[in-house]
C-alpha cells in the first residue's frame, strides 16, 4: 500500500507585484544539446513580490536575438521547482517568447526557514503567487502590447483558474492538469487516493508539521503543512477546490474566453487520467476549450507519464506538438514563434 501511495504526488494536484533583479544572468546551453534548430534564450534570476509581501524566486528567459514577440508564464505542478521547466523555457524563448518561471512559496528558491514553519497554503499558491506572476507578465508586455500565453503543468493548469489577471491572457496551454478528485481515477487507484487524502497526508502532517518528500516518492519535494492539509481537504470533496466555499470569491476560470487547450498524456493513468482532465475542461465554460491527448509513441518513446512532457527528452519533439495547435488557434500568437 505504501509503495502505491508514495507515487501519487502529481495525481491530486492535481496580487500585484514588484520585481527585484539579481546580478546573475546565465546563457543557455548549445542548441545541439537540445536537438532544436532554433537558438535558446538567456535566463535572468529575479524575485517577485506577492500582495502579502512574500518574495518569490523567479527566472525570466529572453530570446537570444531580437525583441520578444510574446510573453509566456509557466506555472509548475504542486511542489515542483521552477528549474524543472528550464529546458522548456529556454526552447520557448528561442521561439521569440519572454518566458517567466517561478517557485511557489515554501518551494525551492521561495522557501524561507524550516519547512514546518512555512505558513503557506494551496490557496496562497493560486491566489497570491500565481497572481504575482501574472502581474509580472502584464508589466513585461504592457508597453508593447505583447500577447500572453499561459502554460500550466498539473496544479499549474488547474489552479490558474483562481488567479487574478488570468482574463488578460490570450491563451492557456495546460498539460496533465486535472480535477484532483479520487472518483475520477480508475480502478484501485481511486481507493488508494481516498486513503492518501483521508489518512496518509493528514496523519503525516499531524506528526511532522509538514508533508515530507519521502512520503510522496523518490525525488519528491516536501510540502508545507498548510499546503498539504488544504490539498487533502480538496481531495476529499466532490469538485476539488472549485467546490470550496472559501475559494468562490477567487474563481476566474469562467472569465477566460480565449483558446484553452487541455492535454492528457495517454499513459498518465495514475496521475491525470482523461476523466480528470475532462472535469477540468468543464470549469472553463466560456473559453474555446479543446481537449487533446499525446502518447509516448507519437514522440518515439515507450513511456512518457505525468512529468515526461517537460523533460529535455523528448523535448522539442513533443513541445512542437503542444505549441503548434495553440498558436494556430490564437491569432495574436501565430507570429510569435
Residue locations for each model-derived region?
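Short beta-strand/loop motif that positions the catalytic acidic residue
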Residues: 256, 262-264
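Conserved alpha/beta-hydrolase
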Residues: 82-84, 89-114
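Alpha/beta-hydrolase active-site loop
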Residues: 119-140
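Conserved alpha/beta-hydrolase "acid-adjacent" motif
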Residues: 269-275
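N-terminal cap/lid segment of alpha/beta-hydrolase-fold proteins
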Residues: 18-19, 29-62
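Catalytic active-site module of serine/aspartate enzymes centered on a nucleophile-bearing elbow/loop
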Residues: 294-337
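Active-site glycine-rich loops that stabilize anionic/oxyanionic intermediates
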Residues: 77-80, 266
Amino acid at each position: 500500500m505504501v509503495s502505491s501511495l508514495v507515487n501519487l504526488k502529481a495525481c491530486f494536484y492535481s496580487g500585484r507585484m514588484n520585481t527585484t533583479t539579481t546580478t546573475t544572468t546565465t546563457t543557455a546551453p548549445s542548441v545541439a544539446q537540445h536537438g532544436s534548430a532554433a537558438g535558446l534564450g538567456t535566463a535572468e534570476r529575479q524575485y517577485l513580490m506577492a500582495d502579502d509581501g512574500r518574495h518569490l524566486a523567479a527566472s525570466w528567459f529572453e530570446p537570444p536575438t531580437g525583441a520578444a514577440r510574446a510573453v509566456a508564464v509557466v506555472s509548475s505542478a504542486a511542489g515542483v521547482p521552477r528549474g524543472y521547466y528550464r529546458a522548456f523555457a529556454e526552447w520557448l524563448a528561442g521561439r521569440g517568447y519572454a518566458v517567466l518561471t517561478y517557485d511557489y512559496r515554501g518551494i525551492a528558491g521561495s522557501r524561507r526557514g524550516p519547512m514546518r514553519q512555512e505558513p503557506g497554503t494551496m490557496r496562497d499558491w493560486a491566489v497570491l503567487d500565481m497572481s504575482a506572476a501574472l502581474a509580472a507578465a502584464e508589466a513585461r508586455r504592457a508597453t508593447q502590447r505583447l500577447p500572453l500565453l499561459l502554460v500550466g503543468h498539473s496544479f499549474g493548469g488547474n489552479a490558474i483558474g483562481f488567479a487574478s489577471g488570468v482574463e488578460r491572457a490570450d491563451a492557456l496551454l495546460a498539460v496533465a492538469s486535472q480535477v484532483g478528485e479520487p472518483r475520477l481515477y480508475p480502478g484501485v487507484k481511486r481507493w488508494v487516493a481516498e486513503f492518501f487524502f483521508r489518512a496518509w497526508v493528514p496523519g503525516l502532517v499531524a506528526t511532522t508539521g509538514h508533508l515530507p518528500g519521502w512520503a510522496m516518492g523518490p525525488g519528491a519535494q516536501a510540502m508545507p503543512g498548510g499546503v498539504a492539509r488544504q490539498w487533502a481537504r480538496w481531495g476529499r470533496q466532490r469538485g476539488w477546490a472549485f467546490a470550496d466555499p472559501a475559494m468562490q470569491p477567487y474563481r476566474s476560470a469562467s472569465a477566460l474566453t480565449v483558446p484553452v487547450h487541455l492535454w492528457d498524456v495517454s499513459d498518465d493513468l495514475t496521475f491525470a487520467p482523461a476523466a480528470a482532465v475532462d472535469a477540468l475542461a468543464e470549469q472553463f465554460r466560456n473559453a474555446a476549450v479543446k481537449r487533446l491527448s499525446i502518447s509516448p509513441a507519437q514522440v518515439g518513446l515507450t513511456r512518457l507519464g505525468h512529468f515526461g512532457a517537460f523533460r529535455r527528452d523528448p523535448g522539442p519533439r513533443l513541445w512542437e506538438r503542444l505549441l503548434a495547435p495553440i498558436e494556430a488557434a490564437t491569432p495574436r500568437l501565430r507570429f510569435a514563434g
